[in-house]
Amino acid sequence: MARPAQVAIVGAGMAGASAARRLADAGFAVSVFDKGRQVGGRMASRRDRETGLRFDHGAQVLRAHGPAFRHRLDAWRARGIVAPWDAPGTHAAVPDMTAPVRDLLAGLEVHVGRTVTGLTRNAAGWRLALAEASEARVFDALVLTPPAPQAERLIDSMAPGLGAPGFAGLRKAAYAPCWSLMLAVPQELPFAGDVLRPGEGPIAAVFRESAKPGRSGAAPHVTLHASPEWSAAHLEETPEAVEAALLAALGALLGMAIAPTHRRAHRWRYALVTATCGAPYLYDAAARLGYAGDACLGPRVEAAYDSGAALAERLAADLA
């Protein structure tokens, strides 16, 4: 009996998880590598060790515009992995935003804390160079799902100048950054509803984490996202300076002094897709190399899911 084709996937966010699940279900051997401490990518969550509070400091909600992701959301909702929150048609994940990605990757070979630094390919297949540990295996196919500039650097490590013409589209993708600020506060902040969207100024939105489904009984805590413009202007500042500036902006917005019991800033350099690659995925059939992500279809979790699934279908057809 022939061994199943071996596929390496770089990135354990929604695009990588979607591609991994489709390929695994089609009978291929999938190995996922991610530099983070946990899966999820920008569907990120952080637990403060002192307070035990969870903060979704990346993507906040899931929405479905098309049938494929709507079907997946319905299945997750039936199993308690997501629940309606904030507005009609929007969902938060339970107990945190990594849950849908963890569900897609359940039972698969996943390596976190593994940074892929280079790629090589010969007649036998693909090899990965890792910063943390050696990886001796040869893979029949390779899927890249990091933000486009990071994927471009990996491809350049193999073919400087993007010698593979099918990946020139990576250069079309553009992103806006986002500074995220996680705050635990003595009491719930005085704004109506679960999400505050000022519409102008340094703050794009404030999300009431303690009101999300599955967080009942949690002490008051919020996640603040700075606006793309403010984040770009302060991109290289220290987290401490950003914390102080955004805390002052929030106090001015609410007309009160805020004394958090916990605060931590996180910078997302590639937060929001502002220009796409112009295709659902990028693929070189001869090399069996593909790229998927929200950079292909737009700034939504659904776009990452659809892109990963579409690339997986194409790759599965070739491998079969």
Model-derived features with residue positions:
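Central helical "cap/lid" subdomain
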Residues: G40, A141-G193, M256
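Short beta-strand to alpha-helix junction loop
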Residues: V61-A68, V82-L105, E236-A245
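A conserved short coil-to-beta-strand element within the FAD-binding core of flavoproteins
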Residues: V112-W126
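N-terminal Rossmann-like FAD-binding beta1-loop-alpha1 element of flavoenzymes
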Residues: A5-F33
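N-terminal FAD cofactor-binding segment of flavoenzymes
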Residues: A44-A83
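Active-site substrate-recognition segment that forms the wall
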Residues: M182-H234, A241, A245, A249-L254
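Flavin (FAD/FMN) cofactor-binding core of flavoprotein oxidoreductases
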Residues: G251-A287
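Glycine-rich FAD pyrophosphate-binding loop
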Residues: A24-R49
